[in-house]
Swiss-Prot record:
Alphabetically ordered keywords of this record: Hydrolase, Phosphoprotein, Protein phosphatase, Secreted
Post-translational modification (record): Phosphorylations at Tyr-122 and Tyr-123 are essential for phosphatase activity.
GO terms for MF: protein tyrosine phosphatase activity
UniProt main location, coarse: secreted
SMART domains for this protein: LMWPc
Organism: Staphylococcus aureus (strain MRSA252)
Catalysed reactions, as listed in the record: O-phospho-L-tyrosyl-[protein] + H2O = L-tyrosyl-[protein] + phosphate
Name listed for the protein in its UniProt record: Low molecular weight protein-tyrosine-phosphatase PtpA
C-alpha cells in the first residue's frame, strides 16, 4: 500500500477536490493499493468540510466526498507521494518538513498543460477550470505511481 497526499493552502478547495477525483479514478481503474489523502499548509480551516464550490463541482460530476474535512500537513506526515497544487505549497511543504522521505511533485507536472500551478478557486471562483486541471492530471499520476511502486492494476 502506498500513500498519496494532495496539498494546497487551506485544504478546502483544490486538494480535497483532487483527493476525491483521484479516489474515483482509482475505483474506476480497480486499483486498490493506493490510499489517497489531502492536507493544507495553513491552519485556519481545520476541521471544515470542502468549500461549497468544491462540493458543487464534485456533486455535478457524481464524485463522492463524504466525511472529508480539512487537515493540516505536518512534519510527522509520512506519505510516499506528495502532490502540491502550486509552487507556494511546495515551498511550504519543504519548510514544514525539510527532510521529506516521499517524492514531492506539483500536480500539473502530470498534465499536458503549459501552466505549472493550479490556481486557487477560493480567489478565482473557477472551480470548473480547477476540476478540469485535476482530472487531466490524475490518470498520468496514477500511471506514474503504479509503475514507480510496482503496483498491479485491475
Amino acid at each position: 500500500m502506498v500513500d498519496v497526499a494532495f496539498v494546497c493552502l487551506g485544504n478546502i478547495c483544490r486538494s480535497p477536490m483532487a483527493e476525491a477525483i483521484m479516489r474515483q479514478r482509482l475505483k474506476d481503474r480497480n486499483i486498490q493499493d493506493i490510499k489517497v489523502h489531502s492536507r493544507g499548509t495553513g491552519s485556519w480551516n481545520l476541521g471544515e468540510p470542502p468549500h461549497e464550490g468544491t462540493q458543487k463541482i464534485l456533486n455535478k460530476h457524481n464524485i463522492p466526498f463524504d466525511g472529508m474535512i480539512s487537515e493540516l500537513f505536518e512534519a510527522t506526515d509520512d506519505f510516499d507521494y506528495i502532490v502540491a497544487m502550486d509552487q507556494s505549497n511546495v515551498d511550504n511543504i519543504k519548510s514544514i518538513n525539510p527532510n521529506l522521505k516521499g517524492q514531492l511533485f506539483k500536480l500539473l507536472e502530470f498534465s499536458n498543460m503549459e501552466e505549472s500551478d493550479v490556481p486557487d478557486p477560493y480567489y478565482t471562483n473557477n472551480f470548473e477550470g480547477v476540476y478540469d486541471m485535476v482530472l487531466s492530471s490524475c490518470d498520468n499520476l496514477i500511471d506514474y505511481i503504479v509503475k514507480d511502486a510496482n503496483l498491479k492494476e485491475g
